[in-house]
From Swiss-Prot:
Gene label: rplL
Keyword Ribosomal protein: yes
UniProt name for this protein: Large ribosomal subunit protein bL12
Gene3D superfamilies: 3.30.1390.10, Single helix bin
Keyword tags: Ribonucleoprotein, Ribosomal protein
One cellular component (GO) term of this entry: cytosolic large ribosomal subunit
Quaternary structure annotation from Swiss-Prot or TrEMBL: Homodimer. Part of the ribosomal stalk of the 50S ribosomal subunit. Forms a multimeric L10(L12)X complex, where L10 forms an elongated spine to which 2 to 4 L12 dimers bind in a sequential fashion. Binds GTP-bound translation factors.
Amino acid sequence: MASIETLVEEIGKLSLTEASELVKALEEKFGVSAAPAVIAGGMAAAPAGDAAAQEEKTEFDVELKAAGANKINVIKVVRSITGLGLKEAKEVVDGAPKVVKEAVSKEEAEKIAKELKDAGAEVELK
């Protein structure tokens, strides 16, 4: 037993490259493969609803649905959020519904949505 523990300790000290070489040498020596075995029939797929419930969305898109009555203030907010020029920001607002910001954290998306709503826009997080 002591020799097995010593062997495990020595293997633990190997670098990743050395460990890879060890695996290749053992595969050749014993005629085996380190690849996982394929099970006939495979695993049962989990229902899609369960996976969606377990996995919380981490990235959100902020979509401008409509500019509302105060279009000028919405354009100003879109400019500050996106860094676009006046013409480009106006095109985004006029072309609503449009995504204003993509793949942002939940907190940032909520902050952006609040700014746009305060300016009079209709906003949706996706």
